[in-house]
């Protein structure tokens, strides 16, 4: 089992996307990249911790590759807006890839360079994986548990539509 650690805005949105991908065994919403140990959602939302909302993805590389996960990541959030995804503004919503090894770093660098070659101004941060702090239980599988919640209804369906149209071959049955 491999792991990936991505931040692309609200973790509810990112989690909802990656739970649809075959080979993804588990997605855990949480926090990483800041200076506060064991931060709470409220602390992260205040913006003082410097943590990003992230998802830790456990995946089977025999079914989906890290590079494929990177493709999904970049296609389902805006990697060109600094510290913002839609109406969510703040460093906690930054676009970030935390890598666990040199292979992941190189794959991310290659993907970012390919996007830059297409004239996209990518602001995604690329850093070694820091300590990951799981978010509170009520954040886990949030969209699955709260599909009619207002924010979820607004923000997640467009991401899932994009996922289904571009990555049908990666979807769980």
Swiss-Prot record:
Has an important function as a repair enzyme for proteins that have been inactivated by oxidation. Catalyzes the reversible oxidation-reduction of methionine sulfoxide in proteins to methionine. Belongs to the MsrA Met sulfoxide reductase family. Keywords: Oxidoreductase. Its EC number is 1.8.4.11. InterPro entries: Met_Sox_Rdtase_MsrA_dom (IPR002569), Met_Sox_Rdtase_MsrA_sf (IPR036509). It comes from the Bacteria. Disulfide bonds: none annotated. This is Peptide methionine sulfoxide reductase MsrA. One of its GO terms (biological process) is protein modification process. It catalyses: L-methionyl-[protein] + [thioredoxin]-disulfide + H2O = L-methionyl-(S)-S-oxide-[protein] + [thioredoxin]-dithiol; [thioredoxin]-disulfide + L-methionine + H2O = L-methionine (S)-S-oxide + [thioredoxin]-dithiol. SUPFAM superfamilies: Peptide methionine sulfoxide reductase. Pfam families: PMSR. GO terms for molecular function: L-methionine:thioredoxin-disulfide S-oxidoreductase activity; peptide-methionine (S)-S-oxide reductase activity. The active site is at residue 10.
């Amino acid at each position: 089992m491999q792991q990936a650690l991505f931040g692309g805005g609200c973790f509810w949105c990112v989690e909802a996307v990656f739970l649809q991908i075959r080979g993804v065994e588990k997605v855990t919403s949480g926090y990483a990249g800041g200076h506060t140990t064991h931060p709470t959602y409220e602390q992260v939302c205040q913006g003082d911790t410097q943590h990003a909302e992230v998802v830790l993805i456990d995946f089977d590389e025999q079914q989906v590759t890290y590079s494929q996960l990177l493709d999904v990541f970049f296609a389902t959030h805006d990697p060109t807006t600094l510290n913002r995804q839609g109406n969510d503004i703040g460093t906690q919503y930054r676009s970030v890839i935390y890598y666990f090894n040199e292979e992941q770093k190189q794959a991310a660098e290659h993907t970012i360079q390919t996007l830059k070659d297409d004239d996209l101004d990518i602001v995604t941060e690329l850093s070694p994986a820091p300590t990951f702090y799981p978010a509170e239980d009520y954040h886990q599988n949030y969209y699955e548990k709260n599909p009619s919640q207002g924010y979820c209804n607004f923000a997640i369906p467009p991401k899932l539509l994009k996922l289904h149209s571009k990555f049908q071959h990666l979807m769980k049955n």
